[in-house]
Amino acid sequence: MNTSLRLNHYWITCADGLETLLQEEIEQLGTKVTERKAGRLIIEGTLEHAYRICMWSRLASRVLLPIHTYELERTHDARDVAEELYEGAISFDWSLIFAPQSTFAIRLHAEREIKVNTQFATLRVKDGVVDSFMEAVGRRPSIDTKQPEITLYVLAGKTEHTYCLDLSGDSLHKRGYRRFMTDAPIKENLAAAILQKAKLQERNPEIVLDPMCGSGTFIIEALMILTDRAPGLVRRFGFNGWHGHDRELWLSLKAEAAERHEKALEQPLPKFYAYDADWEAVKATRENIIAAGFEKLLGDIQIEERTLADWPDFGAENKTAFIVTNPPYGERLGDKASNRSLYLGLSALLQKNFPNQYAAIIAAQIEQADVLAFEAPETLRLMNGKLPIYVRFGTVKLEKVTQPFLANWQAQPVEMEEAQDFANRLQKNMTALKKWATKENIYCLRLYDADLPDFNLAVDLYSDRLHVQEYAPPKKIDPEKAKKRFNLALAAIRAVTGLNRDAIFIKTRARQTGTNQYTKQSTANKRFIVQEGKAKILVNLTDYLDTGLFLDHRQMRLRIAQEARGKHFLNLYSYTSTASLHAALGGAASTTSVDLSNTYLSWSKENFVLNGLTVDHADEQHMFFASDCFEWLKEGHEQYDLIFIDPPTFSNSKKFHGTFDVQRDHVSLIKRAMNRLTSEGTLYFSNNYRGFEMDEEIEALYDVEEITSETIGPDFKRNQKIHRAWKIQHPGLN
């Protein structure tokens, strides 16, 4: 009987989680799966069936042919597994499988309950094979662990050891095209599995996008699927040195695969987009595409260095798109919080650019996948090597186009017996601000700021939530009376705004001191996203006295956004770096943010990532420094075109030697900053100290213009002393 037609059992291995998809693929190749185990399927078929799997399986890891089973006589605790493996190896005549002039290697895998030193046991298996050859033919084969002609896969079990010929040789996920690597790559067979699970071919997309392409694995695997390119067409296999190899059969299968690929290339292909913020990744993608044999298709593939914030207009309104990506979930990014912000930002971009289109996104934690706005989402858990990953599949939801809260708010009659004056004033303020907020798309603003002496509080609107700060009453005021009045105010706030209790966040603000300025108020972490201009910003209404966004500096931030294009921007006392964020989104050549607090710098990075910008990147476009601003200015020499300084009134942080007083120290601070300002640059200086006066020395040294009125929005017109601001330039520019 022709050995190529003989039925044998073969083991087809795969990554954990791929068993179902692999079974579907194998059965589509015309082979029946007879048994299924974790990470392994068993088939019964001919050599042609095995060869077809080697050639065409995009998901399998290895194709193994069991050659020899060594049954154990006893399984007591004191067993010597390594010696058992040696006995099993020497008991079989390996010269029947391959020639002594061939090189070979051993891959040993032990079942979980088997305790064995795998390195030593592998050597004993090698000894057994070599000794078997010496007994049979008097010659021994050589070991080659890097590129062996024959690989023997050995499974050490509880009742038997199984010795297999690895027909695949190297793992099947190694297609041969990955010449250049990036951090945290996805294995080729996992990428293919994700594409097959997502039904890429059936969807017949006109656009295929990977916005964080790394080394280009998804793009290349998609090309292979859509051009009917067999993954085994150009790679080496482990059966060429096997005595049972049918060369003619294999060559016929290769010819068939090549013909199918050539025929598929005649069909139209989608437009491919491969983007990454890292130029090295872009270069790796291009080189790997060429190595995969798709150089002629480069005209259909746009490979560019782009951040998420720099997406072009894809013109996808009337086209079918497919989006797939493996975001840098730790290896190329920072902490979990920044990763969550990345997924939030990616989700928002998908909703804006690709609503109702299908996407498949990898996440390292399920919580990251959960923020993706998908209809009818599905999740697949896989192992990428030793790393568990979650793949979220689904149709991108339509973007929710929201209007500012005041745009839809209508004044209603409100009767508050003991707080009628307050209710009337709040309603009057909201009515006055409504037109402006609607026209300018203002989502965050101050509605009330201690307008009435009996109601000493501030009411700030953040999207559809309120932040109510009760200023600590003077000691002469009865605490119970103050508490009652505050509760009356809260009732009036709910009545006037129509917001529920769970949308109102309450804090008590005492007079600012150096130690409590940024003191954490609770252990909650309830950040949410608000919009300001082009920027999405994370705010927190529960954990700190300040929310992450100083509303009174809105106009200054928007001004910086307009002036920043092409400029190098420096932000001192940057807090959550929202001014830097506006500068970056406004097209700044670079941004540098300096603050003493690591907490707020981490928050800053989350804001940047949320908006699709890179942080801690090799090109140093957006940099963050945890440092005292005085020391930082003294130590560096870089020049900046645009500088913003918004220092605290007073500070005596443990990290800062001595104290900072804005009135006392602003002269030396501004002079140091001006040394870092380019000759035609602009420095904006602002602070919230009500009694602040700009020193005459600064006015004598530089061109100084107070611009306070230009930086206070309509919501703060009732409190002209909320801050003061100056525009400072080197003399002779005006």
UniProtKB/Swiss-Prot annotation:
Protein name per Swiss-Prot or TrEMBL: Ribosomal RNA large subunit methyltransferase K/L
Keywords: Cytoplasm, Methyltransferase, RNA-binding, rRNA processing, S-adenosyl-L-methionine, Transferase
GO molecular function: 23S rRNA (guanine(2445)-N(2))-methyltransferase activity; RNA binding; rRNA (guanine-N7-)-methyltransferase activity
Reactions listed under catalytic activity: guanosine(2445) in 23S rRNA + S-adenosyl-L-methionine = N(2)-methylguanosine(2445) in 23S rRNA + S-adenosyl-L-homocysteine + H(+); guanosine(2069) in 23S rRNA + S-adenosyl-L-methionine = N(2)-methylguanosine(2069) in 23S rRNA + S-adenosyl-L-homocysteine + H(+)
Coiled-coil segments on the chain, per record: none
Protein's job: Specifically methylates the guanine in position 2445 (m2G2445) and the guanine in position 2069 (m7G2069) of 23S rRNA.
Record flagged with keyword Disulfide bond: no
Protein species of origin: Acinetobacter baumannii (strain SDF)
GO (cellular component) term, any one: cytoplasm
Major location category of this protein: cytoplasm
Pfam families assigned to the protein according to its UniProt record, in alphabetical order: Methyltrans_SAM, RlmL_1st, THUMP, UPF0020
Ranges where the THUMP domain occurs: 49-167
CDD domains attached to this UniProt entry: AdoMet_MTases (cd02440), THUMP_AdoMetMT (cd11715)
Subcellular location: Cytoplasm
Record-listed E.C. numbers: 2.1.1.173, 2.1.1.264
Family: Belongs to the methyltransferase superfamily. RlmKL family.
Classification of source organism: Bacteria, Pseudomonadati, Pseudomonadota, Gammaproteobacteria, Moraxellales
